[in-house]
C-alpha cells in the first residue's frame, strides 16, 4: 500500500513540475537560458522516465519500490546540487518559483520516505 501512496505523491509532484516548466517556457521565455521551449523539450525525457517509474509503482512488481526509491533519490540530489544552485538562480526566481521548488522537493522526500519504508518492510501504524 505504501508503494501506491508513493506513486500518487509522485503523480502530483510530476504534474506540478511539468506545469511549472511549461509556464516558465511560455510566460517567462527568455528570462534565462533555462526558460525556453528548447529547454522544456530537453527535459521531457525525465518526465517520460518519471511516468514509467510511476506506472511500475502502480503495477507493483517486486523491484518497483527499489527503482522508485532510486529515482527519487537521484532527483533529490539533482535538485539540491544542480537545479537549485544553477538553474533556479539563473531564472531570477520569484515567489512562485520558490513555492513550486519547496512543494516539489517536499513531495519527492515524502515519496522517497514511503518507498524506503516499503523496501525495509516497515509499516505505518494508525
Language model: regions and residue ranges:
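Hydrophobic alpha-helical membrane segments
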Residues: 67-84, 106-110
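Short juxtamembrane and helix-loop transition motifs at transmembrane-helix boundaries
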Residues: 2-5, 22-37, 92
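Cytosolic juxtamembrane helix and N-cap/initiation of the first transmembrane helix
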Residues: 1-18, 107-110, 114-126
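Core segments of alpha-helical transmembrane spans in multipass integral membrane proteins
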Residues: 16, 36-58, 70-77
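Membrane-helix boundary connector in multi-pass membrane proteins
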Residues: 80-100, 120-123
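Membrane-embedded alpha-helical segments in integral membrane proteins
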Residues: 15-28, 54
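Membrane-helix interface segments
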Residues: 61-64
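Individual transmembrane alpha-helices with interfacial aromatic-anchor signatures
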Residues: 44, 93-110
